[in-house]
Amino acid sequence: MSSPFVPIITADIDWRDDLPYSLQFDDIYYSAEGGINQSLYVFVEGNNLINRWQQLPTNESNVFTIAETGFGTGMNFLLTWKLWEKFAPQNARLHYISCDKHPLKKDDLIKCLQKWPELSVQTEKLIEHYPVLTPGYHHLAFSNNRITLTLMLGDVLECYEQLLFCGDINLEHQLRESYVNAWYLDGFSPSKNQSMWSDNLFTVIAMLSKESTTVATYSASSIVKTALTNAGFVINKRKGFGPKRHMICAHYEKAYSSSKKNRHTPWHINYPVTKEERTALIVGGGLAGCFIANSLAKRGWEVTILEEKEKVGCGGSANQQAVLFPKLSIYKSPFTQFMLYSFLYANDVYKELLKHYNLGELKGSLLLAHNEREKANQQSLIHWLELYPELGQLVDEKQSSELSGISLPCGGLFIPSSGWINSPELCDILIDNKRISLITGNRVQSINYNQKNWVVNDIDASVLILANGQQVNYFHETNHLPVKAIRGQMTTIQSTQESTKLKIPLCAEGHVLPALNNSHRVGASYDIGTSEPELNALDDQLNLDRLKRIAPDIIWSQNVLDHWAGIRAASPDYLPIVGPLPNALEFKEIYSELKSNSKRWIAEAAPCYPNLYVCAAFGSRGLTTIPLATEWLAGLINREISILPRKLIQAISPARFLRKKIIQGP
């Protein structure tokens, strides 16, 4: 199902006496006497954070999670970040989750944060990574992943509700291994913004909390006290900041009930399984395997990659100029949402890498309007791109020629933040970590579980991740996964004096990359169902014919210098397959009643193989979608609160195909 994307309405700010005032809520963001001192008193001291941080274990797998109901100027986040780096153990990690229905535009944010020069170091980084304000989730990493921010743009209840597994208070706590440690209830006053202080929101907050979870807010409203008490929190009154008489602190004790109408059968998640050690085996050394290895190693896990070839970055990940670009749409569906979230996150990841490594270029790419259908699709984006010009710009024939550096026959969609990345080199960089071991020439034909660890080719680990592309369904446990092989061949040709003027990737029916080492890479064929990467001259000619149609006025060399073929793995819905692997027979038995009612509440988690995960089927957009998917998966394995909403976790879940079969029949 799809519906139109509803754009975010940014904050309407009026500056009064050099202070930001919200016209939407008829309230001030902070008072003249407030700001940092108020944040320190209310939220940091109100949650006893510094003392709690100093008692944390000193390992990278430990994550302290703070959740906030209103991001506003970001000052609470920046102050927390600064204090975390000063008082928390060096290896511990902070996950800060926040939400805003009407976020500040970047210019307004800069003006607000200029008031606090003591936060200038953190402010500069936040401004650099401040996201395009599209609806949904944005995940940002700072301080080499020691600080992460999940910024959710939209209604606060809807956003936080999506962090729940099922919405049933009893089952939620049985399933949940990750909780919020401290809450900052910070929004405009209850009389101005009632949705920020609703009973329903506090019920969700309770389901994301455990007995040690604390809450702090500047408010002492009876509405807030009652809502927190009803949700299972014990209230502690404290003197308010400055002239305020009181503020509220609280700690979670026990929630008593939840709404039955908001329950969702948790078919996508399994009951927690003990992990004796923080060790992981990854089958497959392509982009997916290397990214998940990197994400786990950053969390202190010992990782071993088993790769069939002689090195990582082979097979479908061997493209030396892979193109990064989004799939933009005015319609909101699991596919378009996942593609947008993934592109924005991947772009941030690659920009950081390019500061240190010569891996490629992010100077933009051009999607040509090469036929009427593509032209109509691009024209449908006009309003969306007016709101979000950072995502793309529609250009005419003259502009496309100027942007690309060569004569082109049509206009198109210019994606300013896209470009190309050398995938094999990226794989090498990702596994350059003392916690990652690589074993090459290791073909995996079976996997075994010994009631404690997974054993593959006499190597064992507590967690097993299958990231082996089209071969992911070769095992007994995975043979129900509907993965299809798609062969693609790239052709390398000599550059000419004229063709070297090409500055950015061009994409149409095929695509061509700017010259690198006096040659262009042109591609790519798309052979569904072909699982063998044999090279053939017919595909070279197909690529050259498409190249002529992309830029017919340019004299392209017909001299084929080299060619390469890889096998993409894709799912029927072209979303990746990422998450815990269900036992197919048990799944069908437990959820058989979904056939008569797909929304039926079944109070059972998915029957999954213990600590066995899939990370595959990224198709032709792996460079775009793998970074976010693997970061989410690493967080799940490491018992962290999700950086993806439930609806997208379900959209990429390995269990979705079994559920669909139950509902629709064979």
UniProtKB/Swiss-Prot annotation:
Q: Which UniProt keywords apply?
A: Cytoplasm, FAD, Flavoprotein, Methyltransferase, Multifunctional enzyme, Oxidoreductase, S-adenosyl-L-methionine, Transferase, tRNA processing
Q: Tell me the cofactors it needs.
A: FAD
GO CC, any one term: cytoplasm
Residue segments, region tRNA (mnm(5)s(2)U34)-methyltransferase: 1-253
Compartments it resides in: Cytoplasm
Q: What is its biological role?
A: Catalyzes the last two steps in the biosynthesis of 5-methylaminomethyl-2-thiouridine (mnm(5)s(2)U) at the wobble position (U34) in tRNA. Catalyzes the FAD-dependent demodification of cmnm(5)s(2)U34 to nm(5)s(2)U34, followed by the transfer of a methyl group from S-adenosyl-L-methionine to nm(5)s(2)U34, to form mnm(5)s(2)U34.
The name on file for this protein is tRNA 5-methylaminomethyl-2-thiouridine biosynthesis bifunctional protein MnmC
